Swiss-Prot record:
This protein binds to the 23S rRNA, and is important in its secondary structure. It is located near the subunit interface in the base of the L7/L12 stalk, and near the tRNA binding site of the peptidyltransferase center. SUPFAM superfamilies: Ribosomal protein L6. Belongs to the universal ribosomal protein uL6 family. GO terms for cellular component: cytosolic large ribosomal subunit. Keywords: Ribonucleoprotein, Ribosomal protein, RNA-binding, rRNA-binding. This is Large ribosomal subunit protein uL6. Pfam families: Ribosomal_L6. The gene is rplF. One of its GO terms (molecular function) is rRNA binding. It comes from the Bacteria. GO terms for biological process: cytoplasmic translation. Part of the 50S ribosomal subunit. NCBIfam families: L6_bact (TIGR03654).
Amino acid sequence: MSRIGKRPIPIPDKVAVTIDGSTVKVKGPKGELSQVLPPEVVVVQENSSLLVNRRDDSRPARQRHGLSRTLVANMVKGVTEGFRKNMQIVGVGYRLQVTGNKLAITAGYSHPVEIDLPKGISVEVDQKAVPIANSKSQQGFNFGVIGIDKQAVGDVAALIRAVRPLEPYKGKGIRYATETLRLKAGKTGKK
């Protein structure tokens, strides 16, 4: 039995769950999410909790049991609390600007890079520069990608990070706040 899959998912009071065959819909104060689960698992609602069970003990069913439980748990957490991925942008002149559903990133290119934000995803930028650890006394800006769908938040965060990945000599670029960087030593030169 999957250690993750056998744990029940508590349903808060403000959340409504609808199970229609293999489709699970979760509606809460922050929005609504739906997920089609694999046919090897079945979701059962008991009192104020959800149980994810597998239909048989086949290998695909065992593989997808814990995954399905985590997907449903993330939906419940997303519609109640939401998800946030904290990030930092470090570099002289590097900035972020949000206008509507577009994010303009100025990161050392000759033009700002624009990213269309999907529905339900927003970017919150802290306009106050802060010192950044491991980046040779540089200043940077903190920002966060916010949404109710954990996968979409992670996808947008990865897309933003790919615009200017970390540079290992000075520590410039876009990074996750939890990411650690080991700086490389530069050339020593002739003596």
